[in-house]
């Protein structure tokens, strides 16, 4: 889908991702009904946007995770730990209604790459 925003932006040595969701390359939500699958795709998208800004997961300072149902926290957390296995970033996780009813998780990240 096309929305009026940038998937990522850079400034002051920082890389900001917009909220990433479980869209695949065709713009379709993947893993409908499966928070683990959606978390994997969402984080894959985060990593891709970070790379476009010159950052890696090792540069991430902070993530914000939005869950359609906070009861999915543990499942999301298990997938998150696979991407950030050591020295994970600061993180806030909240329950929120997401843009489309099939979306279960959204993640945004801030990374530092220097000036």
Set out the residue ranges of the language-model regions.
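Short, polar/acidic, helix-capping and beta-turn segments at strand->helix junctions
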Residues: 1-115
């Amino acid at each position: 889908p096309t929305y009026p925003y940038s998937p990522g932006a850079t400034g002051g040595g920082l890389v900001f991702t917009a909220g990433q969701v479980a869209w695949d390359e065709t713009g379709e939500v993947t893993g409908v009904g499966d928070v683990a699958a959606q978390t994997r795709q969402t984080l894959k998208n985060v990593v891709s946007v970070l790379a476009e800004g010159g950052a890696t997961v090792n540069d991430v300072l902070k993530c914000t995770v939005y869950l359609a149902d906070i009861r999915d926290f543990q499942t999301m957390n298990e997938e998150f730990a696979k991407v950030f296995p050591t020295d994970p970033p600061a993180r806030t996780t909240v329950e929120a209604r997401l843009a489309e009813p099939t979306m279960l998780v959204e993640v945004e990240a801030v990374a530092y790459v220097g000036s």
